[in-house]
Design a protein with these regions (language model features):
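Extracellular beta-strand ligand-recognition surfaces/modules
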Residues: 1-32
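Exposed, low-structure sequence patches enriched in small/polar residues
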Residues: 27-387
């Protein structure tokens, strides 16, 4: 009966977070009164039913046998969703994503007689998510909040705070080598025995509660592999003329004066992670909260030797060293901590010169011998071996 009466709510609540409403009735009179209170259903009307749209495109370019380039793009706007999705299940943000992927064989740029191979790979991906409503005031459109900013600095700060950006980069060179070897008899110094690989990946993310989150990985590998080709030395083959099988055990003896394979691998791996949480109450200083970081710097080396001294006598030796490149426990951020970065750099170089600090060392040696009983007629039905 009193339509002009108003009920006010103190503060600036977010309607989307209202879970409970309590109604209280107070009797200020001294007399006892009996009342009946009706609370009708409370609901929001005229729900926004604005639709959105999405698009996706792909472009693939092939450069003969040199390589290829692939471009992709994808975007969705607020309000986009499936046909069967409810209004509340549709997108509440604009999403933009694009990527580029390239793969080339650099060896194709050189004459074929050089016999150089260098497969190179690079990829870049970026995703931007822009909410429809201001996360700091979820009843207000973000565009309206940006229009309410009085300076460009305020607009840039609000965009940085409300927009989530994720960037990924990857680069790799795999098994780079010159496939040049000495004909018939490969030599230890042939370029084909050496190969090199390198990869680097980086991920960056910013958002409402994240000033920055960065992870970087490096991996460098060097490989040496030599397998000589030669005829074994058979000193008794021409010396014994008899064709009797009783002489086979001596006549067929041979000696390999070089090992069958020698290999050496060195692998350096480094990982660095850095996370800076955003201080909502102090946006002017992104480093007001403590910086979180973790890192790992390893240098792994292994050696392998396989030598069949004769047809029946086999040797193998393997060793592996896992070492850590020591570094001070400080953030590795040249822009924010220039002095600490120089200390870190000096410490790392000093550790590399000393081949790192060994964490563990493993080695094993195996030998096996098969008695050539098949060369003795009366024992050809038997076998005997040991290792």
């Amino acid at each position: 009966n009193r339509p002009n009466n108003k009920v006010s709510v103190m503060g600036n609540p977010t309607l989307g977070e209202v879970k409970t409403i309590m109604i209280g009735v107070r009797n200020n009179a001294r007399a006892t009164k009996s009342v009946e209170v009706w609370a009708n259903e409370l609901r929001l009307q005229e729900y926004s039913n604005d639709g959105g749209w999405a698009a996706q495109g792909t472009l693939n370019i092939q450069f003969s046998d040199l390589g290829s380039v692939n471009l992709t793009g994808h975007m969705e706007t607020a309000g986009f969703g499936g046909i069967e999705d409810k209004v509340s299940e549709r997108n509440q943000e604009d999403m933009y994503n694009y990527s580029i992927t390239t793969s080339f064989e650099l060896g194709k740029l050189l004459p074929e007689k050089v016999r150089f191979t260098a497969p190179i790979y690079y990829s870049f991906n970026k995703e931007v998510i822009k909410p429809k409503y201001n996360p700091l005031d979820t009843d207000m459109l973000l565009e309206d909040a940006l229009d309410a900013c009085t300076t460009e600095h305020e607009k840039d700060s609000l965009r940085s705070l409300t927009t989530t950006e994720t960037t990924n980069k990857n680069f790799s060179l795999s098994n780079v080598k010159f496939n040049i070897a000495t004909p018939k008899h490969p030599m230890p110094y042939d370029p084909a025995n050496f190969s090199f690989s390198y990869s680097h990946s980086e991920s960056n993310k910013t958002g409402e509660t994240t000033a920055w989150e960065t992870e970087k990985n490096w991996n460098g590998a060097f490989n040496y592999n030599y397998s000589p080709e030669y005829k074994p030395f058979e000193p008794f083959k021409k010396m014994i003329k008899s064709k009797s099988k009783w002489w086979d055990i001596i006549r067929d003896q041979n000696f390999n004066y070089l090992p069958q394979n020698i290999s050496f691998n060195a692998n350096i791996l480094r990982n660095y992670y850095e996370y800076q949480e955003r201080d909502i109450e102090n946006l002017e200083d992104p480093t007001s909260l403590p910086l979180s970081f973790s890192k790992e710097f390893l240098w792994n080396r292994d050696f392998s030797l396989k030598w069949d001294l004769t047809k029946n006598l086999h040797f193998s030796f393997n060793s592996a060293t896992h070492a850590e490149i020591e570094e001070p426990n400080v953030p590795v951020n040249k822009d924010l901590y220039a002095d600490q970065y120089q200390v870190w750099k000096d410490s790392v170089w000093h550790s590399i010169k000393g081949f790192g600090t060994p964490l563990d060392y493993q080695q094993d040696f195996t030998a096996s011998y098969k008695v050539p009983l098949e060369k003795i007629p009366c024992f050809s039905w038997m076998s005997l071996d040991g290792n």
